[in-house]
Amino acid sequence: DLEMNGVPKDNKEAFESSHMEIIEIGAVALDEDYREIDSFLTYVKPRFNEIIEPRYEEMTGISTAMVKDAPGFEVAFEQFFRWCIDLDKEYEIITWSSNDELQIRHEMKQKKYQMSNEVKQFMNGWKDFQKIMGEMLGLERVLSLEKAIELMGLDFQGRQHDALNDARNTAEIYAVVFDDKRDKEALNRVKEALHPKTEGASLGELFDFSQFVQS
């Protein structure tokens, strides 16, 4: 999972490539039994706006002081990449929505990051679990991570919009969906809530439209 800060509009070249810059990368690794075996977390120092804007600080809890001595995007991404490939020769990158993959690609362009063949292969293997789950449940709109956790009757672990916490909650939903040993009652609650019983709920309550709003 990623957390981000805005790029100033007056920096036209940088803003055209990406309106945002990554300020935190968080991930967890699951074994074949869907148990967490490792985690990754780093802050990232933004290049084009070193001041964390108040709305993003409030949302993420990340302050300017917290990223002041953090690695830049290139180093932080390499650390994350190496962490992934050092875990196992066979791995899958699972994200909640395609936004994280797209942000990394946009930021690579923005910062003129040169991808090695190994990194290209790594970037081509990401899976959008939000989309996969939506197709499994026959959803026509985007379900937010927080709403998925809520509808499953699970407790959101930690603070929202914390990269590691969001990654852990995504992993929890992934385990509920794919681990045959897990009770499927939580998944059934989502199906029941989103099909015949959605009439009394507004779309804003059930679905996440934030990814369609451009900063």
Locations of regions flagged by a protein language model:
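A contiguous pocket-lining binding segment that forms or flanks enzyme active sites
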Residues: 123-132
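Active-site catalytic microenvironments for nucleophilic, acid-base chemistry
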Residues: 107-111, 151, 176-180
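Substrate-recognition/cap helix-loop segment adjacent to the acidic, metal-dependent catalytic center
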Residues: 99-124
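Acidic, divalent-metal-coordinating active-site segment for phosphoryl/phosphodiester hydrolysis
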Residues: 162-175
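Conserved non-catalytic scaffold segment of RNase H-like nuclease domains
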Residues: 2-101, 105
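Active-site-proximal helix-loop-helix substrate-binding element of RNase H-like nuclease domains
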Residues: 44, 51, 57-60, 64-67, ...
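Short, glycine/acidic-enriched loop or turn micro-motifs at the edges of active sites
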Residues: 4-6, 131, 169
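Acidic two-metal-ion nuclease catalytic site recognized across multiple nuclease folds
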Residues: 172-215
